[in-house]
Regions:
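Short glycine-/aliphatic-rich beta-strand segments at the starts of folded cytosolic domains
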Residues: 9-29
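Conserved loop-to-helix interface motifs that mediate assembly, gating, or partner/ligand docking
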Residues: 97-126
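N-terminal acidic, proline/glycine-rich, low-complexity intrinsically disordered segments
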Residues: 1-9
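Conserved helicase motor core of SF1/SF2 NTP-dependent helicases
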Residues: 59, 116-128, 133, 137-244, ...
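A short linear hydrophobic-aromatic micro-motif
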Residues: 45-49, 301-302
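Hydrophobic side chains in well-ordered alpha-helices
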Residues: 29, 36, 67-71, 255-258
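Short amphipathic alpha-helix segments
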Residues: 24-44
Length: 365
């Protein structure tokens, strides 16, 4: 880590720390137009950042400077390595350190799963790293979280990695062919034409992770299978890495059917977002399974959040806004139910007849 020396504070509230940067080109650390340093300033707006030569001076309150120094240390470590180094990495690192000061962003972001055509596929948040680690340590893993958190992409990367390492003999990618209220019978074309759009995201991800010329051969040989969930019924899947995507659109019966396909030497990753259920009626199999299998060994539920969104930064804010809206809507619905129940009780009490005197006529004590 870079060495740092305290400079005499200008007063009791402000202190300065000088970070000496060694072993890395300042151009890489600063980024184009000092973009990365500006990202540090955005992460710690109360800290003044000044760069001169290979020195970075951080000035501000003691706690803020210490946090900024820790972030700079991690960025220097990443700059020395082969980590994809951009302003998103700075933002992610700052968020990691804020949520868990004991974590090392440089270590988290350096864990490459695959390298394809010069591009490394790796976890980009702490939540993603814990998710990937869970896949390594458990036979069945559920990745539950909002859109853009890398649930399916990382699961497929782990599947390709397992195939390349000969840990499994084939990859099976599946998803229910129900989405956004559409029914297959009303869609034009053959069954293949109807199903293909639902599976297209899986094909696209495969072509990013593997040589596009190799993928069709593996599909033709059955080494990689991409099929709708209905095609899993009645099968036992041995020595396979199986990924079920969009699991929130499975019924409880379909989820049970799918999980019981597990054979010897196989692993399963189930991904979904319980806030995007497209089933016309009934409950989601993904929602139910979190309660049914919560205590079963060798099954892990990894929950990702808006902090793990790796698409445009606006996506995370959109997810948070919808989460807040849904929570407020549920609270309002609950309040209405309580008011309605109280009103019904009042009406019943108002309409209840007075108790009648049933003593015989002429009765005396």
């Amino acid at each position: 880590l870079p060495s740092s020396n305290e400079i005499t504070p200008s007063d009791d509230a402000i202190e300065s720390v000088l970070v000496e940067v060694d072993g890395v080109a300042m151009v890489r650390l600063l980024g184009p137009q000092d973009r990365l340093i500006k990202a540090v300033e955005r992460a710690h707006p109360t800290v003044d950042v000044a760069v001169r030569g290979n020195q970075i001076r951080l000035s501000g309150t003691a706690d803020a400077v210490a946090a900024a120094e820790r972030l700079v240390d991690e960025l220097v470590t990443m700059a020395r390595g082969e980590v994809d180094f951009d302003d998103a990495a700075v933002t992610t690192s700052a968020r990691m350190l804020k949520s868990d000061p004991g974590v090392s962003p440089a270590e988290v972001l350096s864990q490459a799963i695959l390298t394809s055509r010069g591009k490394s596929i790796r976890p980009k948040t702490l939540g993603q790293k814990l998710y990937v680690d869970a896949i390594d340590e458990n036979t069945i893993v559920f990745g539950i979280g909002p859109a853009g958190t890398g649930k399916t992409y990382l699961a497929m990367a782990k599947a390709v990695q397992a195939l390349q390492r000969k840990e499994v003999e084939r990859i099976i990618l599946t998803r229910p062919a129900v989405e956004a209220g559409e029914r297959l019978g009303y869609l034009p074309g053959t069954l293949t034409d109807k199903i293909d759009p639902y599976l297209r995201p899986l094909y696209d991800a495969l072509n990013e992770m593997m040589d596009p010329e190799v993928v069709p051969k593996l599909l033709a040989a059955g080494t990689i299978e991409v099929a709708p969930l209905a095609y899993m019924r009645g099968r036992t899947l041995n020595n396979s890495f199986i990924v079920l995507d969009e699991a929130q659109n499975t019924t409880p019966e379909q989820m049970k059917m799918f999980l019981t396909r597990l054979g010897h030497g196989s692993r399963i990753v189930v991904t979904g977002d319980v806030t995007q259920v497209d089933l016309p009626t009934g409950s989601s199999g993904l929602q139910l399974v979190t309660r049914v299998l919560a205590e079963v060994d060798d099954i892990h539920f990894a929950r990702l959040s808006s902090d793990d969104v790796v698409r445009h930064t606006l996506v995370g804010r959109i997810v948070d806004a919808y989460t807040k809206f849904d929570a407020e809507k549920q609270a309002a619905a609950y309040q209405r139910e309580q008011v309605d129940a109280a009103n019904r009780a009042d009406r019943r009490a108002a309409n209840r007849p007075e108790p009648q005197d049933r003593r015989p006529k002429g009765w005396r004590r």
